[in-house]
Amino acid sequence: MALVPMVIEQTNRGERAYDIYSRLLRDNIIFLGTPIDDQIANLVIAQLLFLSAEDPDKDIQLYINSPGGSITAGLAIYDTMQFIKNDVVTYCIGQAASMGAFLLMSGTAGKRFALPNSRILIHQPSMGGLSGQATDIDIHAREILRIREITNNLMSKHTGQSLERIERDVERDFIMNAPQAKEYGIIDEIIDRPRV
């Protein structure tokens, strides 16, 4: 079980304790600091929808330090980011790998950032551990190809890179530092101080 820090605030009624994630949420900040699975995706989606309902015109900040994870869970977060009216400002702190990098580049254009020592990794989708009958494996292989086409097209759209370059670069792990990610179009700026 992970340790979640508590924040104590003084109010005119006394003290109030929050877990750190709830306190960040009050400032329109969502922190994605784990592998992405269905449970984490549901939490991030719920936070995006909540913040959008609270104020559809206020930027939502999504801080990412994730090794990636489930394609379907990540695409659910992606679709929600595109669905809500708010601009979603993305930040890479540490690493944004695989689906983490996909979400980083999917932030609002002009509002995608990385800290100087960030590591960004893109690659093609995979669904490891396939076994079973040949027909089932064939079904899953076709699904992987379908999802690869979707994610490659979306990466091309968000980075400005040609589809051919994306297809070539994601064939194997493609690792970038922050300046390389900026040049590639995954982020817009490298920052070392909070934006005001």
Curated annotation (Swiss-Prot):
The lineage of its organism: Bacteria, Pseudomonadati, Acidobacteriota, Terriglobia, Terriglobales. GO terms for cellular component: cytoplasm; endopeptidase Clp complex. This is ATP-dependent Clp protease proteolytic subunit. The active site is at 98 (nucleophile), 123. One of its GO terms (molecular function) is ATPase binding. NCBIfam families: clpP (TIGR00493), PRK00277.1 (NF001368), PRK12553.1 (NF009205). It is found in: Cytoplasm. Fourteen ClpP subunits assemble into 2 heptameric rings which stack back to back to give a disk-like structure with a central cavity, resembling the structure of eukaryotic proteasomes. Its EC number is 3.4.21.92. The gene is clpP. The keyword Protease applies. GO terms for biological process: protein quality control for misfolded or incompletely synthesized proteins.
